[in-house]
Amino acid sequence: MTTSTPALAVTQANGSFETISLERRDLRDDDILIDIKFAGICHSDIHTVRQEWGDITFPITPGHEIAGIVAAVGDGVTKYKVGDRVGVGCMVDSCGECENCKNDHEQFCTKPAVFTYNSLNYDGERAQGGYSQQIVVTERFACRIPDSL
């Protein structure tokens, strides 16, 4: 089942943020659902919502500096369990099958890679970022945050 989550989105270039509801995809075998606790603001978020780096599809929920707690895991997830603290950067998926992906160079994925926002997921839906309460990412695009931090 898809997950509905509140999010902040911009609906037009140079517009203000508005609260919307996002539908996050169903968990695939290698996905994790993250309850977002923190999302940083990067200048790239500002450039994007102002359309200074090219056209975007509105509404858009930016945010690619994400920290949170794993809330659910897909059946094939091996790196994380519910309750783990994780971070997410600017990518959330790649094909995982091309030579670049197999050699840990997902940013050069031949399919191409899926960025955290303003990118198409492989299911054809537009990726939306971390200015929301939850996000679904492929487990290999999360990184563990040590309890000591």
Name the predicted role of every residue range.
Residues 1-67, 133-137:
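Short N-terminal strand-loop motif that marks the start
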Residues 2-14, 80-86, 97, 108-114, ...:
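Short, charged N-terminal helix-start/capping segments
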Residues 5, 19, 53, 81-84, ...:
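A near-ubiquitous, low-amplitude feature marking generic local secondary-structure context
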Residues 25-39, 52-102, 107, 128, ...:
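Glycine-rich beta-strand-centered segment in the early N-terminal region that forms part
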Residues 95-149:
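NAD(P)H dinucleotide-binding glycine-rich loop of Rossmann-like/cofactor-binding domains
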